[in-house]
Design a protein with these regions (language model features):
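Conserved protein-kinase catalytic-loop segment immediately C-terminal to the catalytic Asp
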Residues: 227, 232-234
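Phosphate/dinucleotide-binding and metal-coordinating scaffold of catalytic cores
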Residues: 1-216, 220-221, 234-290
Length: 290
């Protein structure tokens, strides 16, 4: 049940309760069922007892979907205020507090994220992070572009990023990987993630290299939100194992995006983060290849 709930739009996302009421849905989970629980991050779905459906005919990787639900959930585009909205969309299975929707451009699926708070700085930060990865020569990252979107008469910057899963691969977050793993008392969560990843097909050096790179670049950018759902692995449905690290993604909560006063001097060592450690500076202890 927890896994299923985490695939849905969270109840705490701004505006979701009013949107559910408009759609005549009681919960985000029931909204997700309107699209059979289909997602663009994994291959799980619900087969109704009363219908005979086939994955090839309904999956969002190969089949088109309506923009209507995505427009409603992100306050973008035109919607039917009477609630006659097609809910057959992967927008119902995108979690996180920020408003998001999937769009199709030239047959490619893109995730669009919209945030009207903090002048839309998070979208700009994603682009800055991409330029950093590019300058450092790091290949395994998700490219982000900035797209201006009109909301309530205002132009707001949103981020647009291409799908990095496929018909053959699913995203397994670090949280999903270790949530049922009993971590020994003498092992850190950081080492536990590496250990479980290796047991499920990964090469240890590859995992360490990307985690250390991620920690270092997060430090440079002062990304404060590298929680365990913000990095992960790609799982092969055919090989039934992890095959590579997922590209670096979700770095928008960086560059003091929500600060009125930027820390200086010793204050920089006290920055709190949501990750392996409570303080940003302490994260560097995990970096061995310097």
């Amino acid at each position: 049940a927890q896994w299923w709930n985490m695939r849905a739009v969270p109840d705490t996302r701004k505006g979701i309760q009013q949107q559910l009421k408009l759609l005549g849905e009681e919960t985000s989970q029931s909204l997700m069922l309107a699209a059979y629980g289909l997602s663009l991050t994994d291959h799980y779905w619900m087969q109704p007892v009363s219908k005979e459906l086939y994955w090839k005919n309904i999956n969002f990787f190969e089949n088109e979907f309506s923009d209507e639900l995505g427009n409603l959930l992100t306050d973008t585009g035109k919607i039917d205020v009477e609630g006659h909205i097609s809910c057959f969309s992967p927008a119902s299975s995108v979690n996180g507090e920020m408003k998001k929707k999937w769009v199709i451009r030239d047959h490619t699926r893109f995730l669009m994220k919209i945030n009207t708070n903090n002048y839309g700085q998070q979208a700009v930060n994603e682009k800055i992070a991409c330029r950093l990865h590019e300058r450092l020569g790091w290949k395994n990252y998700v490219p982000y572009e900035i797209e201006m979107t009109r909301i309530d008469g205002l132009q707001v910057p949103g981020s647009l990023t291409p799908l990095f899963t496929s018909l053959d691969t699913e995203l397994v977050s670090a949280y999903q990987l270790i949530k049922d793993y009993k971590i020994p008392n003498d092992q850190s969560e950081y080492e536990a993630i590496i250990n479980v990843a290796v047991k499920n097909g990964m090469e240890e050096l590859e995992v360490r290299a990307q985690l250390e790179y991620m920690i270092l670049t997060d430090f440079v950018l002062s990304n404060t939100d590298r929680h365990y759902n913000n990095f992960g692995f790609l799982y092969s449905c055919e090989a039934h194992k992890l095959i590579k690290m997922a590209p670096v993604y979700d770095t928008g909560n960086c560059l003091f995006y929500d600060k009125d006063i930027i820390p200086v001097k010793s204050g920089l060592l006290e920055i709190r983060v949501n990750s392996f450690c409570k303080k940003e500076a302490d994260m560097l202890a995990y970096v061995k290849n310097r």
